[in-house]
C-alpha cells in the first residue's frame, strides 16, 4: 500500500488511480495527516503530491517532519519534490522560464525508478518554481530543456519535477509502478475481484441484520451499489427508484427492465409532482441541488415507513464516487470547493438514516470494472454519467414540464445520432443543456423567438479533467438540423468547446 499526501494538486487523485491501474492499492490523506494515523495504515511508501503553493512562501504547505522518522521510501512530485529539496537543505526559487504542458525528459543516470523506461520521452509539466541547488547527498538523474534537475534521488528518496500521473507523461505509469514495486516492495493485490469480496464482507459486518434503503437513479453508480448490496445482504436491501420527472426519455422503463434482469426487486415511486412543485420559481443552481437532495430524503423516509413491519431501516445507500466528494468539499487537502454534489452537500442535517457509500473511494472506471465483476451488462456499464439531480441541472434557470419535455427530446436525438455514428462509446459523456436564453430565428416565412440548446460532449478518463470532443462539422450539422426540425420550441443549437478546467463538465 502507498499513502499519497495531498498538497492540493488538481492531479492528486490521478496518482492513486495510476497505481491502482497497476494493481497497487493507494490511499490519499491530507498533507497535515498525523504520522500516527499514517503509520496505522502500514504503508510501504509515501508519495508527496504537487500543489499550488511555493515552498519558500510564508503559507507553504508542510507535513509533519515526523514522516521522515517512518523510514519509508518517499517520492516527491512537483511541489512534493521542491519540499524535499527545501527540507534537506537545497534551494528552490521562482523559475525564469515556467513550464506548463509537455516537455522532453532525458534520463542522464540509471535509477531503479527508470528501469524499463525509455531514455527520452515526453512528460507533463505544471510548475512556476524550480530547484536551483540540490541538497547534499542528492543526485540528478534526469533533465528537461528548462529543468536541469527534473528528477533526483538520494537513497530511497526520489523527486520528480514533472507529473508522472498525468496521461500525457508517456512513461509516467511505469515510473510510478517502479517506485511502488521495486523501491517500496508493494505487491499487485488491488483489483475489483478483491474489492468486491472485501466490500461485501465489510457491508455484512456493518449492516448485520439491519435493512438498507438504496437510492437508485438509473445510472451506473447506483446500480452497481444496489447489485453489490444485494449480493451482500439479499432481502435486507430495499432498492428504491424515484421518478422525479427529471429523467431522460424512456429512462424509467429501461431501469425497471434492467433490474428485472439482475433479479433485484425494485420499488418505483412516482414523485414527479412533488419535485416539480418544490422547484417552481427556483433558478439558482445550488438551491435546486439542495431542494432535490432534501426532497429525495423526504420521499425515502416515507417509503421506509411502508417497510417498517419487515424490520427497521437504518441505512441509506448512495453511489457517491471519489470525484463527487472532491468537487463538494476539500476532504483530502487544500483544494477549493467547486460545487456541492447532490449526494453530499445537498443532504439535510435532519436526515434520520445512517449513510453508506460503498463506492466513495472508487473512480468511475473502477466502478465499471466492479460492475462487470458483479455481472452487470457491459452495454449498461458503458452508459454515460448522469447527474443525480437529473435534467434539473441541465435546464438553466427555472424548471418546468415543457422545458423538461423539450430537453428530453433534444437529448434523445443527440445520443441516438452518436450511437448511429459509432461515437457514443468514444466520448466520456454527452448530453444537451437547455439554455435560459431565447434568440431570433426564421421558420418558413415567419419570425421566431425561441429557446437554444447547447450540445456538450467531452473526452476524459476519470472525470477529474476533460477536454471537449472534436466531433465533425457534418455530424454536428446533422444533429442541429434534426433538433431544430423535430423539437418544438428550439430554433438554435450551439456546441460547447470548453474543457475542464476551467469549466466543469455539467453546466450547473
UniProtKB/Swiss-Prot annotation:
PROSITE patterns: GATASE_TYPE_1 (PS51273), GMPS_ATP_PPASE (PS51553). Its EC number is 6.3.5.2. Gene3D superfamilies: 3.30.300.10, 3.40.50.880, HUPs. Keywords: ATP-binding, Glutamine amidotransferase, GMP biosynthesis, Ligase, Nucleotide-binding, Purine biosynthesis. Pathway: Purine metabolism; GMP biosynthesis; GMP from XMP (L-Gln route): step 1/1. Residues 190-383 form the GMPS ATP-PPase domain. It catalyses: XMP + L-glutamine + ATP + H2O = GMP + L-glutamate + AMP + diphosphate + 2 H(+). GO terms for molecular function: ATP binding; GMP synthase activity. It holds the Pfam family NAD_synthase. The keyword Ribonucleoprotein does not apply. Catalyzes the synthesis of GMP from XMP. Homodimer. This is GMP synthase [glutamine-hydrolyzing]. It comes from Helicobacter acinonychis (strain Sheeba).
Amino acid at each position: 500500500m502507498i499513502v499519497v499526501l495531498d498538497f492540493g494538486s488538481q492531479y492528486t487523485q490521478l496518482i492513486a488511480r495510476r497505481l491502482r491501474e497497476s494493481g497497487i492499492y493507494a490511499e490519499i490523506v491530507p498533507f497535515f495527516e498525523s504520522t500516527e494515523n499514517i503509520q496505522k495504515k502500514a504503508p510501504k511508501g509515501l508519495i508527496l503530491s504537487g500543489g499550488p503553493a511555493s515552498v519558500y512562501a510564508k503559507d507553504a504547505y508542510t507535513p509533519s517532519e515526523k514522516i521522515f522518522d517512518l523510514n519509508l521510501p518517499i517520492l516527491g512530485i512537483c511541489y512534493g519534490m521542491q519540499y524535499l529539496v527545501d527540507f534537506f537543505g537545497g534551494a528552490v526559487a521562482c523559475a525564469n522560464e515556467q513550464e506548463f504542458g509537455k516537455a522532453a525528459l532525458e534520463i542522464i543516470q540509471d535509477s531503479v525508478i527508470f528501469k524499463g523506461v525509455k531514455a527520452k520521452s515526453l512528460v507533463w509539466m505544471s510548475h512556476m518554481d524550480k530547484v536551483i541547488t540540490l541538497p547534499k547527498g542528492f543526485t540528478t538523474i534526469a533533465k528537461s530543456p528548462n529543468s536541469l534537475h527534473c528528477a533526483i534521488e538520494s537513497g530511497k528518496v526520489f523527486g520528480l519535477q514533472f507529473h508522472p500521473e498525468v496521461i500525457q507523461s508517456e512513461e509516467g505509469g511505469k515510473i510510478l509502478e517502479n517506485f511502488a514495486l521495486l523501491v517500496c516492495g508493494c505487491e499487485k493485490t488491488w483489483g475489483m475481484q478483491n474489492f468486491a469480496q472485501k466490500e461485501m464482507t465489510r457491508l455484512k459486518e456493518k449492516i448485520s441484520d439491519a435493512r438498507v434503503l438504496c437510492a437508485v437513479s438509473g445510472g451506473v453508480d447506483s446500480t452497481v451499489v444496489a447489485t453489490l448490496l444485494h449480493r451482500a445482504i439479499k432481502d435486507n436491501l430495499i432498492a428504491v427508484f424515484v421518478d422525479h420527472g427529471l429523467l431522460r426519455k424512456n429512462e424509467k422503463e429501461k431501469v425497471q427492465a434492467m433490474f428485472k434482469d439482475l433479479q433485484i426487486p425494485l420499488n418505483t415511486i412516482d414523485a414527479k409532482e412533488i419535485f416539480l412543485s418544490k422547484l417552481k420559481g427556483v433558478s439558482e443552481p445550488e438551491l435546486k441541488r439542495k431542494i432535490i437532495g432534501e426532497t429525495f430524503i423526504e420521499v425515502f423516509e416515507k417509503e421506509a415507513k411502508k417497510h417498517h413491519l419487515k424490520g427497521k431501516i437504518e441505512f441509506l445507500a448512495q453511489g457517491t464516487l471519489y470525484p463527487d466528494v472532491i468537487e463538494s468539499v476539500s476532504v483530502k487537502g487544500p483544494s477549493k470547493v467547486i460545487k456541492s454534489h447532490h449526494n453530499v452537500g445537498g443532504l439535510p442535517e435532519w436526515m434520520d438514516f445512517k449513510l453508506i457509500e460503498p463506492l466513495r473511494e472508487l473512480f468511475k472506471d473502477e466502478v465499471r470494472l466492479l460492475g462487470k465483476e458483479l455481472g452487470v451488462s457491459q452495454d449498461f456499464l458503458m452508459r454515460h454519467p448522469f447527474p443525480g439531480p437529473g435534467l434539473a441541472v441541465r435546464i438553466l434557470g427555472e424548471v418546468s414540464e415543457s422545458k423538461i419535455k423539450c430537453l428530453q427530446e433534444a437529448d434523445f436525438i443527440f445520443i441516438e445520432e452518436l450511437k448511429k455514428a459509432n461515437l457514443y462509446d468514444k466520448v466520456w459523456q454527452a448530453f444537451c443543456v437547455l439554455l435560459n436564453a431565447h434568440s431570433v430565428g426564421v421558420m418558413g416565412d415567419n419570425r421566431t423567438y425561441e429557446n437554444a440548446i447547447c450540445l456538450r460532449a467531452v473526452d476524459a478518463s476519470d472525470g477529474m479533467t476533460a477536454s471537449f470532443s472534436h466531433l465533425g462539422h457534418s455530424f454536428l450539422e446533422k444533429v442541429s438540423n434534426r433538433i431544430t426540425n423535430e423539437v418544438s420550441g428550439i430554433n438554435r443549437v450551439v456546441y460547447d468547446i470548453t474543457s475542464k478546467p476551467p469549466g466543469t463538465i455539467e453546466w450547473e
